[in-house]
């Protein structure tokens, strides 16, 4: 995880629990006057890179910046909040899917799907599907391990 600056706050808004992944973006969405930008795209399409650049630019302007780190990859960002502007930009894809309640009014969907090289991915369809299935299996396994740690008392 990058070193925090004085003008930034770093935290998580989600975690793997015994019941699977739990995200806590709802309170942020319902903060009065908050404008949400919901980024939609596949893995590796630049969502976190975009948010890191936005956070860095805001910090260079002297703005307080809140970075929401990814629970499964703390070097990645799931969101950036700019409290002074009442704006937030979040990764709105699985496992923390966020859909707009008031598109255009409170939330703006930012699609980065055009950055996907669909032709190249299509050539590897079986491998891509296998990797997504493996990811789901490992997330489920992690949830079971956490449940064992929490609910199994030492003998």
Predicted regions mapped to residue ranges:
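N-terminal pre-Walker A segment at the start of P-loop NTPase domains
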Residues: 2-24
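Phosphate-binding P-loop
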Residues: 28-33
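Hydrophobic anchor at the beta1->P-loop junction of P-loop NTPases
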Residues: 39
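The conserved Walker
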Residues: 43
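Conserved glycine(s) of the Walker
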Residues: 46
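Hydrophobic positions on the alpha1 helix immediately C-terminal to the Walker A/P-loop
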Residues: 50
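Conserved nucleotide-sensing/catalytic segment adjacent to the nucleotide-binding pocket
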Residues: 61-114
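Conserved small/polar residues in nucleotide/adenosyl-binding loops
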Residues: 151-155
């Amino acid at each position: 995880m990058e070193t925090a600056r004085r003008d930034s706050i770093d935290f998580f808004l989600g975690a793997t629990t015994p019941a699977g992944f739990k995200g806590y973006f709802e309170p942020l969405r319902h903060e009065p006057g908050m404008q949400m930008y919901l980024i939609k795209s596949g893995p590796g399409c630049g969502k976190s890179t975009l948010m890191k650049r936005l956070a860095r630019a805001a910090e260079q302007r002297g703005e307080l910046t809140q970075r929401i780190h990814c629970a499964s990859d703390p070097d990645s960002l799931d969101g950036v909040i700019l409290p002074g502007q009442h704006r937030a930009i979040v990764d709105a894809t699985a496992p923390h899917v966020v859909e707009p309640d008031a598109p255009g009014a409170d939330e703006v969907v930012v699609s980065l799907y055009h950055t996907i090289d669909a032709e190249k991915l299509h050539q590897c369809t079986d491998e891509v599907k296998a990797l997504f299935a493996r990811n789901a299996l490992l997330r489920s396994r992690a949830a079971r391990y956490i449940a064992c740690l929490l609910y199994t008392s030492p003998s």
